[in-house]
């Protein structure tokens, strides 16, 4: 009984930390990363299509992204979508590929990005704590219904807390690593 509550909580906490990892990958840290362009959608034949479905994105150098569209006629649409995005990137094309040079980050922009990292990490921690609360509520309900003894409740509640501590630690480590990467000049 209590194992399924623990397993469910662990799965949900894992998803929360993975979501944080995806969110942090999208933040620009002065290095080129194809994940930076994940949120960009392109108006393609009347439909909003994710950029990564229209082109291959490669990183030939640390500060350069190369986008090679599958359909050459979509180059101007892709370029327009990148310019309209809030990433502050300037694409240039030579008719067959689009090149994006990633400019070095200013000190002010680095500080803004670290604030975003802290905010994302805090949201992930709140999600993990909410999962802990849900699990504990479920366990208390089961104890009230007679499915768990008082001792079992205490033991499993401690296990849920250990799980929470483990995932909060992972979140802190991810955030710290990203902040370090951003502040690196």
From Swiss-Prot:
CDD domains annotated for this entry?
RRF
Organism of origin? Halalkalibacterium halodurans (strain ATCC BAA-125 / DSM 18197 / FERM 7344 / JCM 9153 / C-125) (Bacillus halodurans)
Query: A GO BP term, please?
Result: translational termination
The terms describing its cellular component in GO are:
cytoplasm
What Pfam families does this protein's entry cite?
Answer: RRF
Location relative to the cell: Cytoplasm
Q: What is this protein called?
A: Ribosome-recycling factor
**Keyword annotations from UniProtKB, A to Z:** Cytoplasm, Protein biosynthesis
**Gene that this polypeptide is encoded by:** frr
């Amino acid at each position: 009984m209590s194992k399924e509550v623990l397993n469910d909580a662990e799965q949900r906490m894992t998803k929360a930390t993975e979501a944080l990892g995806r969110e942090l990958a999208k933040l620009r840290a002065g290095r080129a990363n194809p994940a930076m362009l994940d949120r960009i959608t392109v108006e393609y034949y009347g439909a909003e299509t994710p950029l990564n479905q229209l082109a291959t994105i490669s990183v030939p150098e640390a500060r350069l992204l190369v986008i090679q569209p599958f359909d050459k006629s979509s180059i101007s649409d892709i370029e327009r979508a990148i310019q309209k995005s809030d990433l502050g990137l300037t694409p240039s094309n030579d008719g067959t590929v689009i090149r994006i040079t990633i400019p070095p980050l200013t000190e002010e922009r680095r500080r803004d990005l670290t604030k975003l990292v802290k905010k994302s990490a805090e949201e992930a921690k709140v999600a993990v704590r909410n999962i802990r609360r849900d699990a504990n509520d479920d366990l208390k309900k089961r104890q009230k219904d007679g499915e768990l003894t008082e001792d079992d409740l205490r033991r499993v509640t401690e296990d849920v807390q250990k799980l929470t501590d483990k995932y909060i630690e992972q979140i802190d480590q991810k955030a710290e690593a990203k902040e370090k990467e951003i502040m690196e000049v």
